[in-house]
Amino acid sequence: MAAAAVVVPAEWIKNWEKSGRGEFLHLCRILSENKSHDSSTYRDFQQALYELSYHVIKGNLKHEQASNVLNDISEFREDMPSILADVFCILDIETNCLEEKSKRDYFTQLVLACLYLVSDTVLKERLDPETLESLGLIKQSQQFNQKSVKIKTKLFYKQQKFNLLREENEGYAKLIAELGQDLSGSITSDLILENIKSLIGCFNLDPNRVLDVILEVFECRPEHDDFFISLLESYMSMCEPQTLCHILGFKFKFYQEPNGETPSSLYRVAAVLLQFNLIDLDDLYVHLLPADNCIMDEHKREIAEAKQIVRKLTMVVLSSEKMDDREKEKEKEEEKVEKPPDNQKLGLLEALLKIGDWQHAQNIMDQMPPYYAASHKLIALAICKLIHITIEPLYRRVGVPKGAKGSPVNALQNKRAPKQAESFEDLRRDVFNMFCYLGPHLSHDPILFAKVVRIGKSFMKEFQSDGSKQEDKEKTEVILSCLLSITDQVLLPSLSLMDCNACMSEELWGMFKTFPYQHRYRLYGQWKNETYNSHPLLVKVKAQTIDRAKYIMKRLTKENVKPSGRQIGKLSHSNPTILFDYILSQIQKYDNLIIPVVDSLKYLTSLNYDVLAYCIIEALANPEKERMKHDDTTISSWLQSLASFCGAVFRKYPIDLAGLLQYVANQLKAGKSFDLLILKEVVQKMAGIEITEEMTMEQLEAMTGGEQLKAEGGYFGQIRNTKKSSQRLKDALLDHDLALPLCLLMAQQRNGVIFQEGGEKHLKLVGKLYDQCHDTLVQFGGFLASNLSTEDYIKRVPSIDVLCNEFHTPHDAAFFLSRPMYAHHISSKYDELKKSEKGSKQQHKVHKYITSCEMVMAPVHEAVVSLHVSKVWDDISPQFYATFWSLTMYDLAVPHTSYEREVNKLKVQMKAIDDNQEMPPNKKKKEKERCTALQDKLLEEEKKQMEHVQRVLQRLKLEKDNWLLAKSTKNETITKFLQLCIFPRCIFSAIDAVYCARFVELVHQQKTPNFSTLLCYDRVFSDIIYTVASCTENEASRYGRFLCCMLETVTRWHSDRATYEKECGNYPGFLTILRATGFDGGNKADQLDYENFRHVVHKWHYKLTKASVHCLETGEYTHIRNILIVLTKILPWYPKVLNLGQALERRVHKICQEEKEKRPDLYALAMGYSGQLKSRKSYMIPENEFHHKDPSPRNAVASVQNGPGCGPSPSSTGSTSKSDESSAEETDKSRERSQCGVKAVNKASSTTPKGNSSNGNSGSNSNKAVKENDKEKGKEKEKEKKEKTPATTPEARILGKDGKEKPKEERPNKDEKARETKERTPKSDKEKEKFKKEEKVKDEKFKTTVPNAESKSSQEREREKEPSRERDIAKEMKSKENVKGGEKTPVSGSLKSPVPRSDIPEPEREQKRRKIDTHPSPSHSSTVKDSLIELKESSAKLYINHTPPPLSKSKEREMDKKDLDKSRERSREREKKDEKDRKERKRDHSNSDREVPPDLTKRRKEENGTMGVSKHKSESPCESPYPNEKDKEKNKSKSSGKEKGSDSFKSEKMDKISSGGKKESRHDKEKIEKKEKRDSSGGKEEKKQYPFHLDVFSQYNGKL
C-alpha cells in the first residue's frame, strides 16, 4: 500500500479545518460510488483511509479529527467497518515492525477513538492478540490464542464417523460398476451422475472418495474423456472448486518417493482436466516435484559441468599416457550416468503437449530455464509432433517437392488444440512460438527440420516475387523477421547438434541462398559468437569440435589430403563456424598449410562454403590483430596468408564473393587500404590476371598482344581453367554493382594512402600500400576490361569528364578505365560500317575505321578540354592528348616474336605428346586437339592485330598534323607533353612504360610537326633525381622500364650511322634550330649530324651517372632503393662507358658495405645490382670508342649540350675558324645557364693533395697570369663588342650563345625579347636562380656580347685579335715553363665544353673547380692544375664562333693555314723541351730511389695504350680521366693539313678513326702514336675538351 500513488495530499492535512476535511470527504464520496471490490476505485478508497490514518500515527492529525471524518464517511459505504479493520490490521503490523513507541501510542488512540465504527468481533478477527489486549478488547492474549487453537481443531480436523466396513464394499463396488459399464449406448453423464448421487445417499459414501474413484476409472478409460469430462463438470458443480485439484495433488504426492514413477495415465488425466479448465494450473503446480529452485540449480550445474568438460578438452596433453587417462575418464563418466529422478512437471508438460494444450504447456515452460524442458528428448519430440500437426496443411500445399508423396500427419481430434496453419500468415499464431520453445532440440526430428526449411524457401520465393499492396508487404516483412529469428534460434543450433547430417546442411542452403548475404552473415555471426554459449549441450559440442579439429590439423599434410579432407567435411556439416575459425587461425600462423587446407575442403556443402566466406571476412576484420609487423614497414604475415588462402579457395570452390567484395569496398570507404591485398589475390587467382614488376621482357611483349597471347605467355604461372571462376567474380560484381565503385575507391585511395592513411606510418610502408592500391586498380581494371561485355562496360563507366570532375578520379586512372570503352566503341562502330558495305577494298576499310574513330573520339576531345586549364591547349591539342591516353601497345605494334614463340611451344608440346607412348590414345587425341586449337587461335589473333595496327597507324598519319599546335615554343610543348602525358603514364604500369617510350618513337617516326625528339629525349635523361626520388618501389621499376626502352632506341641510333641516317637523318625531331614558328624546315644543315648525336648520347649517359651517384650518396632510403631498381632495369643499355661504369661500381660497393647491417633490403638490392654490373663489365668500352673526339666543328654539339634550341645557326656548324675570346666567354655562360649543364655532386675534390704542393704553386702563378690577361682582354674588346649588331640567324638575333637574353642595348625590340624567352631551354627553379646570379657577375666583369658577322669581315677581326692572341700565347708559355717535372696536363673529367681557365677570374674559377671536381684523387688533382695552360691555348685556337661572318672559302683556308702553322711551331718547341726533360727524369730515376711521379706513370700508360684504366681511379663521373689522348693528337696532326669544310673534315676524320680501329694491331698503333706525338708540334696545346665525354658505338659494334 505504501508504494501506491498518494491520494491524500499533505496540503489537505495542513489545512484540515479550512479546506482539507471537505476535500477529503469529497474524494471519499466520489470513490464510494463504485461498490465493486475489484475495481481500482475500491483500492483508491482503501488507500485514502490508510493515508489518513498514517498521518494520525505520524502526529500530523489529531485522532479526534480523524474519527469524526471517518464517522461521516461511514455513511457512504456499507462495508466501511470491514475496510477500516483491514487498514487497522496493516497499520498494526507496520507499527509493530517499526518499534517506535510514539507511533504505536498514536495508533492505539486512533483505534480506541474508532471503536464505535468497527465492532469488537471484526477487530478480534483482524488484529493481533497483543494489540487487542492493549485496546482492552480481551483480557489476556495467551488465553485467547489457546482458545482459538481449540476451536479450529474442532472445526477443521475432527472427522465424521462412518461405518466403513458395512457400507464401503457394496457402495464403492456399485460405484465402480456404474462407471465401468459400456458407455457406447444411450448412457449419458447426467444419468450416471444421478446414479452416483443415489449411491452416495444410500450408502452414505464420502463425496471426496467418490471423486477419487471417478478419477481412477478415468485414468483406466482415457478413450472416453468426453464422457468423464462432462461427468466431472457436473459433479464439481456440487463441490468446492479446490477439491478436485487437492485430490489430484494427493495422487501425485503418492508417487513422490525416491524410486517412484508417476504413471503416464495420471499425467494425461491431469492434462485433460487442465485443458477443460476443471482445475487451475497454479493450484496443481505446487503439488508437483521437483521444485522450481531445484530445476534452476540443476540447470546451472549442467552448464558448470559443460564448462568443466571444455576446460579438460582444452588442456595441453604432453604424453600418450595422459591421453589414455582422459579416455578412461570419459568412459567412467558415461557409466556414471544414472536414470534421472521422476520429474512430474515435465511429465505433465509432455501430456499437455500430446493432447494439444499449448497454452498450459507454454505456462509450465515459462516457469523453467530457457530450453530446459526441450532438452529432454520426450518433451522435444512432443513439441515436434505438435508442430508437425499444426503445419501439415501448409506444408502439403507449398513444401512437398515435386514427385514426392510423403506421409500425411493426422490432426488431433481435440477441438481445443491449436488451429492448423493454412497460410504463411497462420504461422505467426502458434508455430513460430512453438519453435522458439523448442530451440536447438529440433535436432531430434530431422524430418520436421526439412519441412520447416522447405516452407521457408517457398515463402522467400513468394516474398521476392511479390508485387502486392503495401499492407501485404508489411505482413510479409513481419513473417520474414520471424523466419530469420527461427533460423537463428532453432535451425542453426539444431544443425550443430545433429550428427554430421550433410543432407540437412544442403536443405538449409536451399533457403539460405534466397537470403541476401547481409542476412546470412548476421545469422552466421550469431551462430558462431552467441549460440554456443546459450546451452550446455552446445558448449560441449563446441569443445568437442575444436578438439577434433586440432586432431585433424595436426595430421594434415599434402600426402593425406583426401582422408583428412573427408574428416574435415564430416566435422563441418554440423559445426562449420567453429571448425573454420580454428583452421583459419592455423593458416594465419603457418602459411605452409594453405595448399593442403584448400585441397581438403572439397567435401564441404554449399552452406559450409558460405560460412567459410563469412569466417574469412570476420578474421580479416578482427580489430585485435595488427595489420603491420612490429617494424611498421611491412604488412603482417597473417594478412598475407589470409589473402593467399582467399585467392586459392575462392578460385577452386563456388563461394559467394559478394560479402568479401563489399567488405573491401567498405574498408576503402573508411580510408583503409590494407585489405586490398585480398582483392588483389582473388582477382589474380580467379581471373588469371597477374600483376608483378618482375615480368621479363618476353612476358611484357606478350602482354602487348591479344587476350590469348596474354594468357599463354604473359604470366609466370600458366593459370588455366579460369573461365568459370572469372565468370563468378564478374557476376558478383555486376549483381551487387561493385565494379565501378571499387575502381573509383581504389583510384581515390591512392592519394588517400599518402595524405590520410600515411600520416604516422613509415615511408616504406606508405609506398607499399600505394603500390598495392595502384597495382590492384590496374589488375581490377584489366579484369573488367577483358571480362565485361561492351554493353555492361559502357553502361557502368561514365564519360571521362564525369569521372574526373564529379568523381574526382585522377586523370591516369580515369583514362585507364575509359580506354577499353573507347576500343569497344570504335570496334563496334567499325563493324557496323563494314557490314553496311561488304567486300569493300582495304582503303575503304581504313577510311571506315578512321570514320568510326572520329565518331567515337569527337565527344572525348570535347570532354578532355575541361580537364586542364585553357593555356595547356596552346601547346598540345585535345586530339593529341586524347589519342595518347586512349591508345595502348596493342594499337602500336604486333609482337610477332611472342606469337612465334608461343606457337613453337605448342608445336614442341604436340611433338612430346606424339612421342609419349604411355599416354592413352583418347587423351593424346584430346591434348593434340587442344594444342591445335590454341595454335589456330594465336595465328588468327596475330593476323587480326596486324590489320588493326595498320589501321591505327593510318589514322595517326592523318591526325599528326593537328597534334602539336605552333602557338608556343617547342620547349613548352615538350614540357606539357612530358608533364601531362609521358610521366603520369610511364609509371602507371609496366606495359604503359613501354607504351610511352614507343609512342615517343612513333611520334618521331611520323615526322610530327613541331615535335622535337631531341629535346624530348634530352629532358627525359637530363635530370632523373627528382623523378626517381618521388617514386614508390613499383613506380621506380616502371620508370626504369621506360628509361630502358628509351635507351634502347637511343642505343640503336647511336650504334650505327646508317640506322641513324635512315631513322633520324631527315626527320624534324632532330632539328637543332628550334624556331618559334611552326616551320620545321628541311635544311640539311639544321639537322644534328651523327657524330654530334653520339656526343649527346654520351652526355645523357653522364647525366644518368651523375644522378645515380647523387641518389646513392644521399643516404635516404627511398633514393637509394629507387635508383638501384632503376639501374637494374636499364642495365642492358647502361652503363656502356667504362669510366662511368666504374664510378657506379665503386659507389654501389660502398652502399653494400654501409647497409649490410643497417638496412638489409638495400644491401640485397645493391649486391644484386653489383653482381649484374660486374657481369656486364666485359661489354663496357672506353669513352673514346663511345664517341669520337676530334677538332671538328662543335657548334652543333655545343648547341645540343646547351639544350636544343639554344645552339648556333646552321651556318656555324661547318665553320672551322675561331672567333675572338668573347665567344669562349659566352660559350661558358651558355654552358652554365643551360638546362643540360652539369650540377655539382660533391665539393671535396676542390682541395689539392698535400703531396703536390709545387704543382699547386705553379698552378696559382698560372692563374694570376690568366687573371691579368683576362682583365686586359675585357677592356680591349668591350668597345668592339658593343658596336656589333645581332647575328643574321633568327636564333642568334634572339639569343646570345649562352642561350640567355642579351643586355638591353643589344635587344632590338620587345617582340624579340618575348621570342627569346620562349626559345630558352627549360630549367628548374634552383638552376634559374643560380644562373641569374652568375649572369649578373659575369655581365659586370666582362659585358660580352655576340659579335656581329655583318659589321666586320673575318680578316679584319682576325687582325684585331692577333696581338691579343700573341700576348695570350706568350703568357701561356711562361706559365708552362713554371710547371716543373714535365707533368702532362690531362683534362679534367668535366662534361662541360672547354672553357679557358685563364678567361675566368680567380674566385669564379675556383668556385667552378669546386663544382666540377667532386672527389679528391691524386691523379685528378694534378690534371686540374696543369690543364689551365693547355685549355687556354687550345681554346684560343679551337673555339668556334657561333655566328660567323659569311667568309669565302679561300679566306677561310688562309686563316686556317696561318693558325695551324703557328700552333705547329709552338708545339714542336715544347715537344723538344718535353723530350729533354723526360730523358733527364729517366736518368734521375735510374740513379736514385725516388718515387716515379704519378703524372709520369700516367703518361707512360697513355703511351702504352692503357690510359683507360689508371692507378688512381676517379670516384665520380665528374673525375673521369680524359681517355685515349693518342687518338686526339693523331687526329689533330692529321687535321692540320685539311683545307676542306666541316662535312669533308668530319667524314675524313671518321674514316681515319675507323680504319685505325679495325686494321692496325695494338702494337703498331702504339708505335705510330708515339712517333706522331714526337713529330706533332703543340700536340698538348691543341688538345680539345669536348662538351661531352661520349661513347661512339660505331667503334665497338663487334665488341657488343
From Swiss-Prot:
Its main location: nucleus. It comes from the Eukaryota. Disulfide bonds: none annotated. Residues 164-534 are annotated as: Bow domain. Residues 1-163 are annotated as: Anchor domain. It is found in: Nucleus; Nucleus speckle; Cytoplasm. Residues 1175-1597 are annotated as: Charged domain. A motif (Nuclear localization signal) lies at residues 923-928. Pfam families: Tho2 (PF11262), Thoc2 (PF11732), THOC2_N (PF16134). One of its GO terms (cellular component) is nucleus. Belongs to the THOC2 family. This is THO complex subunit 2. The gene is THOC2.
